[in-house]
């Protein structure tokens, strides 16, 4: 399924990863992954979802096109087995390695979405924090603690497809 909407000389098209029409290849200026990669990573072994998404993103981008990523970030000292996406968190090093393996070049990062109060580790899930507050809706004290932390610590990364 693919749609094109024109607004202010901008064409927005969408498709599902793994089913991107070939006529979209090499046409996009940008691809965005906003708090989505943890879901792809957690099912990578069952269906190659992360790899497929990276390959499709690379295919649809024009040379020099960019990929913006906002993702719940696990601290680098956390266990890989925990930071595999199941709890909502991924390590920055994991994302950078996956993007490099797909052919993308790292361009920049921003701390705009960082939250030092979110020190998640084994046993924690991202959905414990606002806005979900999973596990604390009936516990006023725990809910207040989660609200004091605020939303998750998130990495904000920029990559590009090399110019040919």
Regions inferred by a protein language model and the residue ranges of each:
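Conserved class I S-adenosyl-L-methionine
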Residues: 41, 65-90
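Conserved catalytic loop of SAM-dependent methyltransferase domains
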Residues: 110-132
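A short acidic, Gly/Pro-enriched loop at the edge of an enzyme's catalytic core
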Residues: 21-32
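Short alpha-helix
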Residues: 88-109
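Residues lining the SAM
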Residues: 34-37
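C-terminal lobe and adjacent flexible extensions of AdoMet/dcAdoMet transferase-like proteins
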Residues: 102, 141-164
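Single conserved hydrophobic/aromatic residue that forms the stacking wall/gate
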Residues: 1-12
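A short glycine-rich, Lys/Arg-flanked "PGG" loop and its adjoining helix->strand segment in the class I
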Residues: 47-63
């Amino acid at each position: 399924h693919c749609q094109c909407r024109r607004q202010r000389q901008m064409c927005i098209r969408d498709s599902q990863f793994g089913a991107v029409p070939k006529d979209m290849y090499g046409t996009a200026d940008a691809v965005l992954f906003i708090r989505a990669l943890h879901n792809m990573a957690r099912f990578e072994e069952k269906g190659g979802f992360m790899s497929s998404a990276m390959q499709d993103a690379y295919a649809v981008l024009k040379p020099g096109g960019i990929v913006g990523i906002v993702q719940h970030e696990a601290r680098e000292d956390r266990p890989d087995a925990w930071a595999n996406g199941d709890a909502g968190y991924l390590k920055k090093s994991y994302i950078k390695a996956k993007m490099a393996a797909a052919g993308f070049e790292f361009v920049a990062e921003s701390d705009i979405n960082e939250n030092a109060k979110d020190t998640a580790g084994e046993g924690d899930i991202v959905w414990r924090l606002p806005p979900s507050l999973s596990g604390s809706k009936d516990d006023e004290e725990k809910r207040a603690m989660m609200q004091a932390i605020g939303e998750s610590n998130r990495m904000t990364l920029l990559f590009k497809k090399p110019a040919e």
